[in-house]
Design a protein with these regions (language model features):
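Bacterial N-terminal signal peptides that target proteins for export
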Residues: 1-8
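Bacterial N-terminal signal peptides
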Residues: 8-16
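N-terminal pre-domain segments of enzymes
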Residues: 21-82
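Sequence context surrounding c-type heme c attachment/ligation sites in exported
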Residues: 21-33, 97, 115-339
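Short, well-ordered loop/turn sites that connect or cap secondary structure elements
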Residues: 100-103
Length: 339
């Protein structure tokens, strides 16, 4: 018998034996030690989050999820996942951020292009260790076969879905803390009950992965459903909550601005209406108020959103271009305010 045929025959016999004994060949489990240990794994594959990294096919106990209103990053597609260790579950805390057990992980991959042209750029992971959360960025290779740890970050030239050529920035490890920080501690910022679908949370509840369905769940609108006939205020407030409030809130990285752009904030002055900036400068564009009712073009908030120039642009990190759709919704919200 030729060697190749002998190997094939052996494989068939082995498979037949496994089937005869009721053995199911399962993919390797997620590497809990890589998540909870002290080391920083050099490659994304060491975690075992995906059965197929290129296809972003999640492994067992890795759950895909989506946000009603997602954070905008130069038009990148975001593929979001959470991993929960065996027997662990999420805990709902009102409409706010879900509480994750130690050993959990949050995974987010950034991609550009569609179909066969889709290119994975980076995957960011948040690891919940005993001492707190750790944020690590991983950069995908050109072959799309592996992502390697990029503690120093990096830049990639690419074209956005809007056709704009940009230098896309992968944040370094310390820059991850700029957004993922409150009161000096690294925290998740995305999976809040108010910004997750009731269907997804119901599925997690049924699977024993969520302790309860909290009141106030899914109160933020689905951004993809916005039309010119939609009320501007809830969409604008949701956009500001997701894109700005991780810094602009008490305890956030920009709390000294005095702005609190969280969804639940109801004080008009706190969200910028008729509020003068704490510190002026070219970032104010010569304007006097963060939000001037009825006058979007005289509002500092919109001026900074509508810029990609360093020192003016807001957010400071995570974008190299302007989100025209986001600007349009916030512009309409301000324009429709009573003077």
């Amino acid at each position: 018998m030729r060697p190749a045929r002998a190997l094939l025959a052996a494989a068939v016999l082995a498979l037949g034996g496994a089937m005869a004994h009721g053995t199911v060949l399962e993919p390797p489990p997620v590497n809990d030690t890589a998540i909870a240990g002290a080391a920083f794994p050099k490659t994304l594959s060491e975690f075992g989050f995906f059965q197929d990294g290129r296809a972003q096919d999640p492994a067992a106990r890795v759950h895909a999820y989506a946000l009603n209103t997602p954070l905008w990053s130069d038009g990148a597609e975001k593929l979001r996942f959470i991993y929960l260790p065996e027997g662990a579950r999420l805990t709902a805390d009102g409409e706010g951020l879900l509480q994750f057990p130690v050993g959990a992980a949050i995974i987010k991959t950034f991609a550009f292009g569609e179909g066969a042209e889709r290119r994975l750029i980076e995957t960011r992971v948040l690891l919940h260790r005993a001492e707190g959360w750790v944020a690590l960025p991983y950069r995908w290779n050109a072959e799309q076969t592996e992502a390697t740890l990029a503690l120093a970050g990096g830049r990639i030239d690419l074209t956005t879905p809007a056709g704009e050529a940009i230098s896309y920035a992968i944040p370094n490890k310390n820059q991850c803390k700029t957004c993922h920080s409150k009161d000096g501690a690294v925290i998740p910022i995305g999976p809040k009950a108010r910004n997750l679908s009731v269907k997804w949370m119901g599925e997690m509840l049924k699977a024993g992965r969520l302790d309860r369905l909290p009141p106030g769940a899914a109160t933020m609108p689905v951004w993809a459903g916005y039309t010119d006939q939609s009320p501007a205020e809830p969409f604008a407030r949701a956009y500001l909550d997701v894109n700005c409030a991780h810094c602009h809130q008490p305890g956030g990285g920009a709390s000294n601005s005095g702005l609190d752009l969280r969804w639940e904030q109801s004080d008009p002055h706190a969200i910028g209406i008729m509020k003068r900036p704490v510190a002026a400068g070219r970032g104010a564009g010569g304007h006097d108020f963060s939000v001037l009712p009825g006058q979007p073009d005289a509002s500092i908030l919109l001026y900074r959103m509508d810029s990609a120039e360093p020192g003016i642009a807001m957010p400071e990190l995570g974008k190299a271009s302007v989100d025209k759709d986001g600007v349009a919704v916030v512009r309409r919200w301000i324009a429709e305010m009573q003077r």
